[in-house]
Amino acid sequence: APVGQCLPVPQGWSDVEAASLPETLFTVWSNVFDRGRLQAGETLLVQGGSSGIGVTAIQLAKALGARVIVTAGTDEKCAACLALGADHAINYKTQDFAAQALRLTDGRGVDVILDMVAGDYVEREVQCLAEDGRLVIIAVQGGVQSTFNAAVLMRKRLTVTGSTLRARSVAFKSEIARACLRHVWPLLADGAFKPVVHRVFDATDADGAAQAHALME
């Protein structure tokens, strides 16, 4: 990696644990805190809380003083998200996430949504955002086409944005690294953010690489 994108191994972390950080941390910082402008005391809704991005978003948002609601596809995944610090977890297969998000915020809505689904989720996300809320789309697992009520967007003064890091410049990614070093690295040393490593594979072994690929699928 370019030197500007490299960061020191956090105090008390192993090399394996540290290797789990950059991909998800850069994504969460740049989208939730830069584009989404999440502030302490606000409420974040994470679509897919048990994913790698979701796990990082839960811990980082909580460490920086936000309230976190997540969605996940099984009760077990919801429980895992709660164990990581999420305030509430919604099983999107058995509950309407938008209705639940409104209920959990006493009808006010959430301030920021980190969305990895898009598709028909966007219409419901617009409905459950608070006034001046921000929707940040970072993946389109549910489809690239979305429709929503533009009148609601105008009335609530919503911001709908999105990004992908892959196409960004080395200079841009290096700035994210510097921001993470300033704002996140002290949390890692203090234990406010803990590594979550599901399994470790030997990359030099063909079987290990195949097993890793199968697990990701």
Regions found by a protein language model. Name each.
Residues 37, 127-129, 187:
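Conserved helix-to-beta-strand junction in the class I
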Residues 173-217:
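C-terminal hydrophobic helical "lid"/dimerization subdomain
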Residues 13, 50-52, 120:
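Residue-level detector of alpha-helix initiation sites
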Residues 1-8:
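Structured surface patches comprising rigid loops and adjacent beta-strands/short helices at the edges
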Residues 69, 83, 88-161:
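Glycine-rich cofactor phosphate-binding loops and adjacent beta1-alpha1 units
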Residues 18-95:
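Mid-domain Rossmann-like dinucleotide-binding core that forms the NAD(H)/NADP(H) cofactor-binding site
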Residues 28, 61, 81, 111-113, ...:
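Terminal peptide-recognition signature
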